[in-house]
Every structure is written in structure tokens, then in C-alpha cells.
Amino acid sequence: MANAESKSDRAFYAPSYEQWRAMFPQTGMLEYRAFLPALVQFEIWTADRVAAALAQWSHESRGLQALEESFAYTPERLLAVFPVRVKSLAEAERLVKRGPEAIANVIYGGRFGNRAAGDGWRYRGRGPTQLTFYDNYALAGAALNMPLATQPDLVKLI
């Protein structure tokens, strides 16, 4: 391809530590230093791509403070957010009473590689991106050379 850029042709952009701290005040140098190699590994080179990644991580993890998905829904909110998976307010009320694991299994069960009973909870949102579903854990694990599909709690450490 005539217009394709090689990796060496791309300018590398990374936010300064001060910019990082402004966006993620609860973190420190350790997290910042862990973040920089990920930019290189996953070819997040440009300011636009870095900004998009940081915005996504910030939104999904409440500023890198929530590294595991909460299922603290009211029945009304559960029905509003997941109307395809939760069909009625009565069903939402039953799920909320049963707790977070039941909610996760209904919302995430039976799709994107989640096949076994309990997979919705097992492969719930974790990490800065709130990675969900077995298939995504397997893909991310392959990219990171980590056994995320068999040890999903490792995502919280990334």
C-alpha cells in the first residue's frame, strides 16, 4: 500500500506524568510507567489514539478507581440499561434481590464465548477497559501472552 506508514514513520505521543495525574489523580508513577509500554505494544501512537484510549479507560473505570464491574443497579436502572436481557421490572427486582452474580450471569451469559453456567460472572468487566466475555478475555490473553481466559482475575492486575 502506497500510503501505509511503517512504525518508524509514526510520531510517538505520550501524555506527560502531570497530564496523567490530572486525569487519574488516584494513581502514581507506578501506574504511569506501566501504561507507557502498553501504548507501544498496541500501537497507540498518535495523540488522537492516546486521547481515545485514556478517555475510554477513564470512563469505564471511573478514573482507574473501579477495576471490577459493579452490579449495584436499582431494578429500574437494570431494566433501562439491559432491556434485551431483562424483560420486566419484576424480573429486574428478582435479579437485584439475588445479587451481583445473578445479574452478571443473566446480562453476560450465553454469548461471546460465555457458555458455562457462571461465565457471566466469571468474565464480568475488569481492568481499565472493563473487559467482558470469555472471547474477549481469550483474545486479550493471547495479545498479552497471559492466561486471562483461565485466570480472569489477572485482568485486575493489568
Question: What is the meaning of each model-derived region?
Answer:
Residues M1-S8:
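N-terminal secretory targeting signals
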Residues S8-L30, S58-I158:
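Peptidoglycan-targeting cell-wall enzymes and recognition modules
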Residues A47-R62:
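Active-site-adjacent structural elements in enzyme catalytic domains
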Residues Q41-I44, A116-G118:
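Short helix-to-loop capping/linker segments positioned immediately adjacent to catalytic or ligand/cofactor-binding
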